[in-house]
């Protein structure tokens, strides 16, 4: 596999001030005691403390009204916090105004759910617009736009108009336009919510590619756990303006602690099938096997081994249902096993099952069909 290179036209228009010796070990973005209150007393954010590492893809998820949009919009000062601090490269941006605020927003690109393209301008003209407004020389604009069209895969659509593009192509234009000033941070506000599943996967793959090739820090908000699973390194869960859970994606998916997280994960986790649920009893009938839930949270890096499970339990074992997926190199999921063990032997069966899974739970007994 050949190494990918960044087109020369994607080099910065002008260098950003950096201090590698002091910034290398600090978070790229840090929020301390952040709060946001709107007129009428609506408290959108409460006591948010958060660190986002340089170069990571960081996800913010929550239900509608949880405070996701308010949070992401404080990062480029589209919203001014009511309390607390937003620090970029360890510098508080709360006092920025005028030219300092303009410079900040050029360092922080943003894409939205709705593409906000100018219908009377071509793809090339839409991408070039921020550079024209900034007074960048024409030749430099053409070079820069050509590199961005190559990056997002729209070279052949350079002279097309938005009405001639698919939703995924429109979002690619939005991404290219957000990158014109060579930002260090890219904010994504529900960037795939208006797309079909195929276009969603393509846009997420493009964002991950951009993250790796350009070293951008990407912060995205979504209400879809599948998006978090696909692209993010770490995630926070918001509810009523507060962080209720956070961690590496595999940690949050493998062992969700908060009810909101479990609810958001509901459609992605292997649920108990209805026919099996109908046969489940808490008190065993004569000869009814026990139903065990073997859970794999990723904490031990254990990989489910069906033969090892059968040998460890040492009883008649039937796999009735389950699902395992890999997230960040770890196996996560659950296996539902029907085990033909007499009640007196159940403690020993559970002890053995605990040797081959991260968590074991007795769900009940399966009545004979």
From Swiss-Prot:
InterPro entries the UniProt entry points to: AAA+_ATPase (IPR003593), ABC_transporter-like_ATP-bd (IPR003439), ABC_transporter-like_CS (IPR017871), ACT-like_dom_sf (IPR045865), MetN_ABC (IPR041701), MetN_ABC_transporter-like (IPR050086), NIL_domain (IPR018449), P-loop_NTPase (IPR027417)
Domain of life: Bacteria
Alphabetically ordered keywords of this record: Amino-acid transport, ATP-binding, Cell inner membrane, Cell membrane, Membrane, Nucleotide-binding, Translocase, Transport
E.C. code: 7.4.2.11
Single GO molecular function: ATP binding
Span of the signal peptide: none
Gene Ontology cellular-component annotations: plasma membrane
Domain ABC transporter: residue ranges: 29-265
Residues noted as binding ATP in the record, renumbered to the chain: 62-69
Membrane topology reported for the UniProt record: Peripheral membrane protein
Reactions catalysed: L-methionine(out) + ATP + H2O = L-methionine(in) + ADP + phosphate + H(+); D-methionine(out) + ATP + H2O = D-methionine(in) + ADP + phosphate + H(+)
Job of this protein: Part of the ABC transporter complex MetNIQ involved in methionine import. Responsible for energy coupling to the transport system.
Subunit structure: The complex is composed of two ATP-binding proteins (MetN), two transmembrane proteins (MetI) and a solute-binding protein (MetQ).
Protein name: Methionine import ATP-binding protein MetN 1
Organism: Pseudomonas aeruginosa (strain ATCC 15692 / DSM 22644 / CIP 104116 / JCM 14847 / LMG 12228 / 1C / PRS 101 / PAO1)
């Amino acid at each position: 596999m050949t190494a990918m290179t960044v087109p020369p036209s994607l080099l910065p228009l002008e260098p950003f001030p950096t201090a590698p010796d002091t910034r290398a070990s600090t978070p790229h973005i840090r929020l301390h005691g952040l709060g946001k209150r709107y007129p009428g007393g609506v408290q959108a954010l409460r006591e948010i403390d958060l660190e986002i590492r340089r170069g990571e893809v960081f996800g913010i998820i929550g239900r509608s009204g949880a405070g996701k949009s308010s949070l992401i919009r404080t990062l480029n000062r589209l919203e001014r916090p009511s309390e607390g601090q937003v620090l970029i490269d360890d510098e508080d941006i709360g006092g920025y105004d005028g030219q300092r605020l303009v410079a900040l927003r050029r360092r922080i690109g943003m894409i939205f759910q709705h593409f906000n393209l100018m219908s009377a301008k071509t793809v090339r003209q839409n991408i070039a617009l921020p550079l024209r407004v900034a007074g960048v020389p024409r030749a430099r604009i053409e070079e820069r736009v050509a590199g961005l069209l190559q990056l997002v895969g729209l070279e052949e659509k350079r002279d097309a108009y938005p009405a001639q593009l698919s939703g995924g192509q429109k979002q690619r234009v939005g991404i290219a336009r957000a990158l014109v000033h060579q930002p260090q941070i890219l904010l994504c506000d529900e960037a795939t919510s208006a797309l079909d599943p195929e276009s969603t996967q393509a846009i997420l793959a493009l964002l991950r590619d951009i993250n790796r090739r350009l070293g951008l820090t990407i912060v995205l908000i979504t209400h879809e756990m599948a998006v978090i699973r696909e692209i993010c390194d770490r995630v926070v869960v918001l509810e009523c303006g507060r962080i209720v859970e956070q961690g590496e994606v595999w940690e949050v998916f493998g062992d969700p602690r908060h009810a909101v997280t479990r609810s958001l994960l509901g459609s992605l986790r292997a649920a108990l099938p209805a026919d099996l649920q109908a046969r489940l009893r808490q008190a065993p009938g004569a000869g009814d096997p026990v139903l065990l839930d073997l859970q794999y949270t990723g904490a031990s890096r254990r990989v489910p081994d069906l033969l090892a499970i059968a040998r460890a339990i040492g009883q008649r074992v039937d796999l009735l249902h389950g699902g395992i997926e890999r997230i960040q190199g770890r196996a996560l999921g659950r296996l539902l096993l029907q085990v033909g063990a007499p009640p007196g032997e159940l403690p020993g069966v559970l002890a053995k099952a605990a040797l081959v899974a991260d968590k074991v739970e007795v769900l009940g007994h399966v009545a004979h069909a």
